[in-house]
Regions:
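Helix-coil modules at protein/domain termini and other flexible surface or pore-lining loops
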Residues: 1-146
Length: 146
């Protein structure tokens, strides 16, 4: 069983109870109707990214849906938190790529996103035998993958 399509979504939930907050985030993301099963971070070969709207047409309420999820929570008022999924897809569609989850405190969503992308890219680089200098800027590293 290997997915041929994937979509990304995001959500934010606020409530005094953590479970209710998580449910609100799932609703905000549009995936509250599904039984989510977490999987690790492999982007399948020959898989394509589709819109959330298109992806939701393929799944029904109560269905088991496999997902890579980044989740962060806090009970501290005004605490800055972020979570993000990074994706690294090889040029050769027949090879697998990586999805990385990142969860942080005190970091903006933009910084969390950059970190998750870098993490996914570094995991992919190791499988392709590409030297990956973590101290190099993203724009420079991105050229290695093109």
């Amino acid at each position: 069983m290997s997915p041929k399509k994937i979509f990304f979504t995001k959500g934010v939930g606020r409530h005094k109870e953590r479970l209710a907050s998580f449910e609100a985030a799932l609703r905000d993301a549009g995936i509250e109707k599904f039984n989510l099963v977490y999987v690790s971070s492999i982007f399948p070969p020959n898989c394509r990214i589709i819109s959330k709207e298109e992806g939701l047409k393929f799944i029904n309420p109560g269905e088991i849906v496999y997902c890579v999820m980044a989740r962060q929570e806090t009970d501290e008022h005004n605490r800055l938190i972020a979570s993000s999924i990074g994706v690294a897809i090889p040029a050769d569609e027949n090879q697998y790529g990586y999805l990385s989850e990142h969860h942080s405190h005190g970091e903006t969503d933009e910084k969390a996103g950059e970190y998750a992308e870098d993490l996914a890219a570094s995991m992919l680089a190791t499988t392709l035998g590409i030297e990956f200098d973590e101290n190099m800027g993203w724009d420079e590293r991105e050229q290695v993958y093109k």
